[in-house]
């Protein structure tokens, strides 16, 4: 219709007005049909196209066979989202037995699958000794070429390639997700149970059967009901199982951060019959499966975790509609859930198994199965190897949204593998993983059939049914023990909930903000402490000093021209939301910065002792030289910078110089390029940072638009002794200046003062 509007003639009324009056009563033309057609051919064509379009539309919607329309809509969606739904002929897939590997004739039902990147660990040697279980070690590009362990089957990259699995085309060479090859190999060689483990876990008492329900049917199966979380609250969709086993202040990797503060024990449980706990998640003593936020904030840098859980707490099941994080370190899979072993390849490394776990739990409900969590089954030793927050980005960004999506998702497929493929495709559409995992899922499912796995049957889903009322007789009470967290050195108390909640809130707010610190003091005695203090909150802590220290990752910079060093840091962390600069004589009370707008500039323009105007005394003094440099730079500024600066300084007489001590300021991402442009304008000029920074800020934006958060900081211009600093400090202020830190003892005194605002800091001293 838009095309028709553009080419349509003007209305007849306007044409009549334009005709001379003498033509109004001219003799009419003879109505010849052929001439009429030639005169109106364009109208006929347009009307004809319109009629055909409308007819086609109604035909597609009203015909009994709507396949054409559905196909059209599907293709439109695919073209918009660049996704292709795999089409698989399941009946054409033939079972292929292993005929080439040295283990072609070997078959056993119970397997332990691990990924190895180093020579065999003592824990892995212990796994080999577990009776009745076969260890399968999966190598990658980081694995030593001469890797060998008696009693274990080792699949190198070359050995994996010879298996001809479809998934090999999609796997990275240097990742633990190559365990997916091992799962298929185990299934091909008779697996009925697969224990998904790592090479740092030691099975307690060396007996998996003592801890897990290895047998679900038959004489050896435990015929007993299992405690189950109550389904009474439909809005409760995820739980922290560590609370049930005695540790309220510990949370598992993959638990949404907004749920960390929920530490109350269950009012009551229900029960479920055993036999369908096809995925069994074990708890790990020592180093449990915790995320980088917990690992980086709940202990000192070199102190290994040694957390213990209650071994006497009963196992607990999850009802449909409620989920729990599941990992690849300590989990038993029964054959009915082998399809759920697939490790995604398009997400960050520390998110792969957790996303797999949530994906698998949702699909498990389609089979009438459920996940159960078991008391401590292994002891994992902490090697004090922190992993970066970025490795978990797909967890902290997406996991809460993923859980909500999975609970709402429904499928109309009639075969289970089609249901799996449908969910994987929709998850790619929603951005939880990419098309790589759609293709990987298709290859995985075909490989499962090829190695002899039988597709499970779908069962009715209970999510859409009215929940059964929980009667008084159905309620089962269990009060978990409250074990002390030994690593904290204190007994846990009720306030831990709000303390952890605050920490998570601060981390969520500043987790993508880079802190840049210039150390005037000796970095050998303070750099690690500053990173420990602020690294809990910010994305990273970049430390600069007048002297470089490669061992401590301290970069060299001159304070007088510190602003010239910042653009390189901006480029290195280009995805950051913003950058806070602070000198080590200024304390940043981050808990009082939450209300500040991270899209605005922050500086101390409202602090009169920090932001000052100086009138140079003569042409030769230092202030006059700096003022001349400012004039020269302003004259070369692009119009938007120059207008801002002159508007901000219009009340001065043109000879005064604006200065700022610049111990603390913030540059948001949207002003990073402006800051860099201004640095380039300065070039090699010897402009002092106390002059350059206020000039930059006044050029980038109007002071009226600065966020006033730093305006209430405690600021004294004279140097402070430690005793005067103690009386100067206020936990209510956004920042405090000055504060002298020259050694570990000074740092401890500072932390004790800051603990008024962040009580968890007392763990560091």
From Swiss-Prot:
Give the enzyme's EC designation.
Answer: 2.4.-.-
Any idea which GO molecular function terms this record carries?
glycosyltransferase activity; identical protein binding
Q: Keyword annotations for this protein?
A: Glycoprotein, Glycosyltransferase, Golgi apparatus, Membrane, Signal-anchor, Transferase, Transmembrane, Transmembrane helix
- Recorded topology in the membrane: Single-pass type II membrane protein
Q: Which residues lie on this side of the membrane: Lumenal?
A: 65-765
Q: Which InterPro entries match?
A: STL-like
Q: Which GO terms describe its cellular component?
A: Golgi apparatus; Golgi membrane
* Transmembrane segments annotated in the record for this chain: 44-64
- Compartment annotation: Golgi apparatus membrane
The positions flagged as glycosylation sites are 235, 723
**Family statement:** Belongs to the STELLO family.
Miscellaneous notes for this chain? In classical Greek, STELLO mean 'to set in order, arrange, send'.
Write the protein's name: Probable glycosyltransferase STELLO2
């Amino acid at each position: 219709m838009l095309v028709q509007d553009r080419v349509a003639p003007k209305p007849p009324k306007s044409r009549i007005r334009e005709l001379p009056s003498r033509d109004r009563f001219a003799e009419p033309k003879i109505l010849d049909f052929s001439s009429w057609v030639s005169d109106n051919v364009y109208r006929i064509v347009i009307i004809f196209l319109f009629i055909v379009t409308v007819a086609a539309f109604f035909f597609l919607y009203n015909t009994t066979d709507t396949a054409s329309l559905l196909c059209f809509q599907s293709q439109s969606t695919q073209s918009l989202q660049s996704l292709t739904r795999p089409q698989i002929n399941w009946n054409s897939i033939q079972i292929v037995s292993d005929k080439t590997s040295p283990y072609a004739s070997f078959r056993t039902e119970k397997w332990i699958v691990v990924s190895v990147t180093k020579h065999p660990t003592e824990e892995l040697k212990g796994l080999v000794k577990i009776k009745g279980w076969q260890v399968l070690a999966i190598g990658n590009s980081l694995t030593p070429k001469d890797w060998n362990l008696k009693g274990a089957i080792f699949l190198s990259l070359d050995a994996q390639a010879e298996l001809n699995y479809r998934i090999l085309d999609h796997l990275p060479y240097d990742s633990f997700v190559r365990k997916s090859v091992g799962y298929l190999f185990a299934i091909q060689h008779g697996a009925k149970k697969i224990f998904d483990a790592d090479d740092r876990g030691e099975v307690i008492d060396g007996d998996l059967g003592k801890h897990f329900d290895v047998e679900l049917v038959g004489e050896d199966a435990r015929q007993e009901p299992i405690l189950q979380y109550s389904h009474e609250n439909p809005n409760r969709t995820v739980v922290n199982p560590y609370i049930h086993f005695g540790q309220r202040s510990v949370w598992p990797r993959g638990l949404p951060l907004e749920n960390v503060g929920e530490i109350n024990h269950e009012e009551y449980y229900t029960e479920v019959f055993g036999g369908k706990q096809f995925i069994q998640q074990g708890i790990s003593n020592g180093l449990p499966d915790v995320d980088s936020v917990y690992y980086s904030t709940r202990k000192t840098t070199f102190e290994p975790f040694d957390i213990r859980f209650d071994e006497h707490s009963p196992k607990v099941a999850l009802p449909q509609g409620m989920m729990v994080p599941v990992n690849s370190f300590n989990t038993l899979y029964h054959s009915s859930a082998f399809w759920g072993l697939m490790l995604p390849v398009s997400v960050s490394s520390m998110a792969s198994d957790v996303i797999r776990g949530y994906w698998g739990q949702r699909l498990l409900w389609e089979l009438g199965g459920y996940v159960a969590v078991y008391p401590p089954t292994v002891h994992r030793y902490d090697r004090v190897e922190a992993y970066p927050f970025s490795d978990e980005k797909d967890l902290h960004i997406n996991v809460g949204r993923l859980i909500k999506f999975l609970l709402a998702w429904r499928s109309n497929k009639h075969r289970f593998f089609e249901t799996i493929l449908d969910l994987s495709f929709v998850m790619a559409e929603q951005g939880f993983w990419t098309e790589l995992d759609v293709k990987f899922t298709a290859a995985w499912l075909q490989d499962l059939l090829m190695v002899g796995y039988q597709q499970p049957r779908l069962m009715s889903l209970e999510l859409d049914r009215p929940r059964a009322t929980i009667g008084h007789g159905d309620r089962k009470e269990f009060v978990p023990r409250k074990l002390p967290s030994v690593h904290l050195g204190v007994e846990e108390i009720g306030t831990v909930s709000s303390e952890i909640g605050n920490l998570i809130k601060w981390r969520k707010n500043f987790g993508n903000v880079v802190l840049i610190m210039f150390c005037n003091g000796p970095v050998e005695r303070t750099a690690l402490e500053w990173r420990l203090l602020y690294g809990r909150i910010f994305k990273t802590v970049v430390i600069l000093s007048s002297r470089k220290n490669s061992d401590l990752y301290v970069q060299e910079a001159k304070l007088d021209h510190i602003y010239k060093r910042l653009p390189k840091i901006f480029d290195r962390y280009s995805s950051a939301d913003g950058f806070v600069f602070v000198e080590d004589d200024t304390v940043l009370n981050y808990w009082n910065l939450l209300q500040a707008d991270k899209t605005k500039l922050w500086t101390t323009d409202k602090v009169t002792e920090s932001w000052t105007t100086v009138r140079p005394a003569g042409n030769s003094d230092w202030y006059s030289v700096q003022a001349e440099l400012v004039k020269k730079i302003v004259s070369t500024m692009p119009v938007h910078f120059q207008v801002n600066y002159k508007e901000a300084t219009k009340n001065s007489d043109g000879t005064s110089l604006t200065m700022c001590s610049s111990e603390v300021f913030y540059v948001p991402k949207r002003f990073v390029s402006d800051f860099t442009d201004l640095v380039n304008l300065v070039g090699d000029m010897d402009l002092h940072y106390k002059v350059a920074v206020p000039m930059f800020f006044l050029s980038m934006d109007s002071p009226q638009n600065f966020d006033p958060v730093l305006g209430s900081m405690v600021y004294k211009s004279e140097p402070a002794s430690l005793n005067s600093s103690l009386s100067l400090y206020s936990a209510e202020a956004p920042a405090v200046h000055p504060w002298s830190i020259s050694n570990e003892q000074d740092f401890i005194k500072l932390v004790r003062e800051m603990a008024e605002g962040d009580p968890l800091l007392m763990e560091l001293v």
